[in-house]
């Protein structure tokens, strides 16, 4: 019993340390919300609308590329080594952003930082999925999502604290940015002591090392059985050539890619990052003063963390499909109400409070259902040999849609107003509900190897009989 307790304790340590990649992901995507006003001052980087957009979006471009190359590097070097490498990039690029003397250095540093963010968005969920036992994989993988939203909340809180206490210091934005160097150091030194993924070790023929790792996080009998299951799955793939983009055109793999791309797009076209990146501007647009809007932005961060706790709890009890459907219906309804009330209550002192309550409601559904399911399913639907490449391609798509939404939102807001902008997202939300209902398989309760078998079986059967809870792929 004591040995089993040590195994669980070590597994929890693995989860805590590796998900600091998610914390960095969240902090670095959220911190600019409060840093930009100070950064843009004439005696600092002197940003205009164009360069401000470049500083913001350069991270997203880098993240898109980091997702693709991070997946391939993860397959080649291993999940653990890749996370160590990403921690170094996080640290160096954070220092580059902090001490940037001009906008050019800032854009380059943000781009490099984005590569680390994108790489972490692929590698950390894959590492967690491959270390977790099947019955708790959902809860453990979505710990990363919890760390992402916690990182965003920390960014909002530190921005508010530093902005309030050091607002008269023109370099306050540099203090906001440099904070991210601390979790980068923790991630690096923590991962040095963590083991490599047993599934990756088997893929490299290191079966004894894989068994040694499994015995550290499973009881001996289960470790041996799980190793056999991994070996059996790998033997089927061992006869195939090394994974390339051409492999993604194989019919049964193509279906997985289609589902993965759909999940990635669905998560972003809800408009979540229009709220996470421009939440303060949305609240100001609805009638709040700047200070009240900043406080409201912290409320958005708090509800994101609380909702993610609920989402992690639900994943162990509810299927992926019903969670995603419920989340999409909730977010689409919240956006519809924002659009309607922005028209009906235009100019009313009640409008900003209504909009704030609805953005909080939106984030409760987004972070409590949609986002946890997204990252979990992307980490579990691809077969071992294609997991790094497959996640890289789908998360590249996720980041590019993220960029498109984040880039166009302020343009739409200025051109057609708050209500019409959100009506567009309502239309996209309806399309997302239809996609999930028609195409999304259920993966709860299945091992990664069983999922692969089901996708292969779907290809041989030629048609899916039922898109409900029982799934053939």
UniProtKB/Swiss-Prot annotation:
Keyword Transmembrane helix recorded: yes
Annotated GO biological process: D-glucose transmembrane transport
MF terms (GO), sorted A to Z: D-glucose transmembrane transporter activity
Locations listed in the record: Cell membrane
Signal peptide positions (record): none
UniProt pathway: Polyol metabolism; myo-inositol degradation into acetyl-CoA
Gene Ontology cellular component list: membrane; plasma membrane
Matches recorded under Pfam families: Sugar_tr
Residue ranges crossing the lipid bilayer per the database entry: 14-34, 49-69, 83-103, 111-131, 146-166, 172-192, 256-276, 295-315, 325-345, 350-370, 389-409, 411-431
Keyword rRNA processing: no
Keyword line: Cell membrane, Membrane, Transmembrane, Transmembrane helix, Transport
Entries under CDD domains matching the protein: MFS_XylE_like (cd17359)
Membrane topology classification: Multi-pass membrane protein
Induction and repression of expression: Negatively regulated by IolR. Induced by inositol.
Role this protein plays: Major myo-inositol uptake transporter.
Family: Belongs to the major facilitator superfamily. Sugar transporter (TC 2.A.1.1) family.
Annotated PANTHER family: D-XYLOSE-PROTON SYMPORTER-LIKE 2
Misc. remarks from the entry: When iolT is inactivated, inositol uptake is almost abolished even though iolF is active.
Entry protein name: Major myo-inositol transporter IolT
Primary gene name: iolT
């Amino acid at each position: 019993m004591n040995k089993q307790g040590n195994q669980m304790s070590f597994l929890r340590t693995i989860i805590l340390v590796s998900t600091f990649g998610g914390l960095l992901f969240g902090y670095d995507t959220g911190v600019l919300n409060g840093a930009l006003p100070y950064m843009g001052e004439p005696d600092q980087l002197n940003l205009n609308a164009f360069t401000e957009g470049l500083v913001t979006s350069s991270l997203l471009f880098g993240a898109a590329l980091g997702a693709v190359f991070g997946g391939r590097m993860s397959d080649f070097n291993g999940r653990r080594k890749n996370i160590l490498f990403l921690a170094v990039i996080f640290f160096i690029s954070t220092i580059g952003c902090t001490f940037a003397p001009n906008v050019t250095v800032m854009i380059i540093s943000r781009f490099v930082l984005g590569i680390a963010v994108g790489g972490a968005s692929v590698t950390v969920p894959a590492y967690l999925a491959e270390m977790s036992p099947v019955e708790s994989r959902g809860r453990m993988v979505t710990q990363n999502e919890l760390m992402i939203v916690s990182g965003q909340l920390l960014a909002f809180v530190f921005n508010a604290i530093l902005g309030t206490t050091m607002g008269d210091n023109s370099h306050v934005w540099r203090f906001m940015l440099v904070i991210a160097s601390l979790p980068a150091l923790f991630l690096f030194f923590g991962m040095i002591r963590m083991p490599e993924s047993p599934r990756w070790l088997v893929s490299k023929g290191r079966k004894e090392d894989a068994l040694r790792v499994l015995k550290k996080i499973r009881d001996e009998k289960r470790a041996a059985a799980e190793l056999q299951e991994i070996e059996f799955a790998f033997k089927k793939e061992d006869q195939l050539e090394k994974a390339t983009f051409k492999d993604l055109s194989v019919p049964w793999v193509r279906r997985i890619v289609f589902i993965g791309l759909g999940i990635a797009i669905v998560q972003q076209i809800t408009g979540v990052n229009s709220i996470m990146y421009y939440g303060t501007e949305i609240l100001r647009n609805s009638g709040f003063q700047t200070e009240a809007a900043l406080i409201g932005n912290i409320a958005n961060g708090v509800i994101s963390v609380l909702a993610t706790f609920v989402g992690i709890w639900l994943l162990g009890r509810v299927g992926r499909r019903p969670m995603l459907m419920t989340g999409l219906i909730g977010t689409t309804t919240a956006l519809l109400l924002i659009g309607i009330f922005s028209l009906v209550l235009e100019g009313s002192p009640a409008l900003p409070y209504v909009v704030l309550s609805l953005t909080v409601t939106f984030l409760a559904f987004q972070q409590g259902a949609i986002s946890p399911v997204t990252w979990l399913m992307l980490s579990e639907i691809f077969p071992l040999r294609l997991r790094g490449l497959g996640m890289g391609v789908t998360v590249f798509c996720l980041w590019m849609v993220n960029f498109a939404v984040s880039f166009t939102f302020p343009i739409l807001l200025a051109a057609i107003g708050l209500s019409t902008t959100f009506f567009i997202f309502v239309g996209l939300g309806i399309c997302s509900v239809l996609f999930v209902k028609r195409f999304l398989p259920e993966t709860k309760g299945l091992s990664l190897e069983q999922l692969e078998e089901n996708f292969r079986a779907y290809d041989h059967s030629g048609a899916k009989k039922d898109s409900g809870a029982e799934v053939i792929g």
